[in-house]
């Protein structure tokens, strides 16, 4: 009997434990996009702009009453367009900055990296454009429903937005990897450029050091007065040379100024002669016309006066 009761007790406890295990829900794993978005907040300017686009898209995905209202008034698509343009502008500027640093890298390597990065950038832009197009399509479909239930449209939009967000995450991850390779190439190119400069300047620096050591050793054996006198002679010769060059240069400048002034005076004289000739030509054109108009005017005045005189003469009367 005791064995039976013990078996029943064990079965009861096992059932209770199974129910408890069914009630306990598993912990939700954090979304990977949260970690990625945290990196955007402290990254490059294009990543900061992308973070603002992502925050706004996540708010749109809630499909709250305010979101639906702004979707119908095209407010959402306008905001997304501005955020998209800002992101692509900052990304283009960052790519140009890296391209300048890639100049020491081989042309083939630079072309390959640029092509891969451009393809990743195009995918991101296309998917962002797909988000905007899908929201614009939703607005058109809702407006066409004419007050009917839009629950199915909202569910379908939410599903599309989830898929698009996953695609955007993949695009951004791929783009960041491409940019990292691009940046590594730029860093390698900069290091190569510095090494090349060192290789070129190294022999010159060594020659300068050797020359300075030679001059120092030669001057060390001379008395101080002789060294000062030698330096003074060199300085005087240098100043005379500079002064001679300066005087020659001033003479050249004076000659050029005189030549320019002579040309300007010649051109001014030519312009005066041309103006006088043009004035005389105008006078020869218009003087006959003015004289003819004066003659016509005088004839017209005489005719008018004659007509007025004839009309003012007394009319003879018929009464005798």
Swiss-Prot record:
One of its GO terms (biological process) is cholesterol efflux. The modification Phosphoserine is found at residue 149. It holds the Pfam family Apolipoprotein. Residues 269-320 are annotated as: Homooligomerization. InterPro entries: ApoA_E, Apolipoprotein_A1/A4/E. Residues 212-293 are annotated as: Lipid-binding and lipoprotein association. APOE exists as multiple glycosylated and sialylated glycoforms within cells and in plasma. The extent of glycosylation and sialylation are tissue and context specific. Glycated in plasma VLDL. The modification Methionine sulfoxide is found at residue 145. Heparin binds at residues 164-167, 232-239. Keywords: Chylomicron, Endosome, Extracellular matrix, Glycoprotein, HDL, Heparin-binding, Lipid transport, Lipid-binding, Oxidation, Phosphoprotein, Repeat, Secreted, Signal, Transport, VLDL. It is found in: Secreted; Secreted, Extracellular space; Secreted, Extracellular space, Extracellular matrix; Extracellular vesicle. Transmembrane segments: none annotated. It comes from the Eukaryota. Gene3D superfamilies: Apolipoprotein. Belongs to the apolipoprotein A1/A4/E family. APOE is an apolipoprotein, a protein associating with lipid particles, that mainly functions in lipoprotein-mediated lipid transport between organs via the plasma and interstitial fluids. APOE is a core component of plasma lipoproteins and is involved in their production, conversion and clearance. Apolipoproteins are amphipathic molecules that interact both with lipids of the lipoprotein particle core and the aqueous environment of the plasma. This is Apolipoprotein E. It comes from Plecturocebus moloch.
